[in-house]
Design a protein with these regions (language model features):
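Interfacial loop-to-helix junctions that mark the boundaries of transmembrane helices
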Residues: 2, 58-65, 151-157
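Long, contiguous internal "core" modules enriched in hydrophobic/ aromatic residues
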Residues: 84-182
Length: 182
């Protein structure tokens, strides 16, 4: 019987969500604010998992991995904020085409958004660091969850992917519902 606790669940959710942030952001098509939303959301889940794990039923490797996920997420967030003036390459082209199309149809022209070409863009690979670090903690949590260990690890990893995919898809869909001009 597998024994799954809240700390493992929160780490699964955070790692899966952060992995799918990399999946959706690696082609440079989603806006910078979406990355901020995802990093904050899943960073808080990683922090919650770390706190619950330390207080309730510590698994040292899981907690160390959770702390590393949290630090990597904060670092990625800081780099993203520092480089925000560069914008996102794929989004720039889409925004310019849509603005021109709306202006042609309605005669309403929006102010052009300017980007700073002297600032480097956020490197999408940085979003992969936290999930890779979290993978170690998920394996440790799966082994700790019960026998058979291989099955418990597989359930933990598949659960992380499922939670991350579903939550990221919902957040992405709702993010674009509230974006003006899309």
């Amino acid at each position: 019987m597998i024994d799954l606790d809240a700390a493992t669940f929160l780490l699964q959710w955070a790692v899966g969500g952060l992995f799918f942030l990399w999946v959706t952001g690696r082609r440079r098509e989603v806006g910078i604010g979406y990355g901020w939303t995802i990093r904050i959301t899943f960073g808080l889940m990683a922090a919650g998992g770390l706190v619950v794990g330390v207080v309730m039923d510590p698994v040292p490797v899981r907690e160390a991995s959770g702390a590393a996920v949290l630090v990597a997420t904060v670092v990625a967030m800081v780099v993203s904020v520092v480089r925000r003036r560069a914008g996102v390459a794929g989004q720039r082209g889409v925004e310019e085409r849509r603005t021109a199309r709306v202006a042609a149809m309605t005669g309403i022209d929006r102010d052009r958004v300017t980007f700073d070409d002297s600032v480097r863009e956020f490197p999408p690979a940085l979003d992969l660091v936290a999930p890779v670090l979290g993978l170690v903690g998920l394996v440790a949590a799966g082994v700790d969850a019960g026998d058979p260990a291989l099955l418990a690890v597989a359930r933990t990893l598949v659960g992380a992917l499922f939670l991350g995919a579903v939550t990221s898809a919902m957040l992405l869909g709702h993010w674009y519902l509230v974006q003006p001009g899309l």
